[in-house]
Amino acid sequence: MSDITYLQLQSIIDHMLSTGLSYSSCKKVRTLISQLFDYSIINCWCTTNYAKFLNLGHNKPVRPHKPFTTQAINRLWRLGPPLHDIPLILLYTGMRASELINLKARDINRKQRTMRITSAKTKSGIRTIPIHDRIWSIIERRLDAVYVIHECRTYSSLSREFNKAMRAINTKHTTHDCRHTFATRLDNEGANYNAKRLLLGHASGNVTDGVYTHKSLGQLRKAIRLLK
């Protein structure tokens, strides 16, 4: 720890900010570094906690999530593959970008046309999502590779491909706007409340320990099919 300099640490923070990491995420990293330095000082491994001097810049307010309009979704369909693949999969599954990046072909059940999310951070996030009929051909076309989105193995690469599609249809959205749109559309179509929570990976009192009964899967399919 005594060999680590302030400039080295600040350059790490600067790089994180330049790649689009949020202020709150960088603050958590600074807190962790500070705790490591405090522990090192107690054990006489160093004498100064440089984390206290790290500059995170200004905490800019995060843009509120904006749902896609029906017109924008229709423009995505007209855009065609492969450019429209990522946004449409996100829009019709409600997945997080990180979940899509980690989705493997083996997680897809061809017979039942479902996908199993296993890379979630929480227990409730591990879930099964029925695949909407409209995006089945997109998914099926990608099942020869190990990963469904084989061309994007990092968030930054997925974000680049997503932004290409947004520019092509002349709109501005984030990947998380797709998840927000998914939830909003289900609400607008009167989807079952518990089905919506299960699809999004939120905890629900009706389904325990991640066990999906035939009935609950049927409810999920019914909810998914409400999306046009």
Where are these regions (language model features)?
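Short, basic (Lys/Arg/His-rich) helix/loop patches that form interaction surfaces
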Residues: 23, 78-80, 93, 129, ...
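Short amphipathic helical patch at the helix-1/turn junction of helix-turn-helix
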Residues: 17, 31, 90-92, 186-188
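Conserved tyrosine-mediated DNA breakage-rejoining catalytic core shared by Y-recombinases
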Residues: 55-56, 70, 93, 102-138
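Major-groove DNA-contacting interfaces characterized by cationic-aromatic clusters
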Residues: 2, 47-48, 111-119, 134-164
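N-terminal core-binding DNA-recognition domain of tyrosine site-specific recombinases/integrases
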Residues: 1-39, 43-45, 152-157, 172-177
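Basic, Lys/Arg- and aromatic-enriched nucleic-acid-binding interface segment
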Residues: 23-29, 42-97, 101, 121, ...
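Catalytic-site neighborhood detector that most strongly recognizes the C-terminal catalytic loop/helix
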Residues: 67, 121-123, 200-226
